[in-house]
Amino acid sequence: VPSDYDAYLQETGMPENEIQKLDEHVKQFIVDDLKNGDGKFEYMKIDVGKQAMNGREEDFEWIEFYASAFQIGSTIYIYPTYEFAENKKPCGNDSFSFLLGEAIRPYEFGGTLWYKDRTMSDWEVSGNLIANNQQLNGASYSGSQLGTPRSAMKFMGTTYCHASVGTGDDNRILMGYSYQPKEVRVELFGWRLSRKQIIFVLAGGVVVGSVWWRKNKGKTQK
């Protein structure tokens, strides 16, 4: 049976297949936040990508990324979300990062973390998420707030990003998760270079890799 949250999201023009990808808790998180906004939001299509930050792309089969965006006037609300598909054990040094194209200029961040162990049938709230590294074109959430469980379990982090319409037409979002980095946190950073973007992957202030994020390509280039 479709929930009230489904009905609200349908009203925004969000496609049904996108709605059904979302966990019920995530739908509620999004709808509650949209209702706190100023007026009636409409679904906004964005180009979603992901980046393996400390490993190969195939290492990322155990994590799912989602992002939905909604717009009213010059205001955009975006919800970058990750979900573990397998039980894992974050070490207190993980990070979840996202970068936005120049069409979106963020100014406020926050979120909620859920957990679910082997004995649980539904998610429980772990706590609030705070963007402890905020950029002009994105943010990262890192450290013990992403979970430090004694045994492996699933985590789901839903974040909100309130933004205003930017200068360009590049409406991509690139998300990445760094799982159990060896010594220091790994985060995404971006510098705009004319019509392209180069994404630096940083570990403790040292560039450990870079990615060309091209304007007219659907996927990221290694």
Q: Where are the language model's segments positioned?
A:
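N-terminal propeptides/leader regions of secreted preproproteins
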Residues: V1-E61
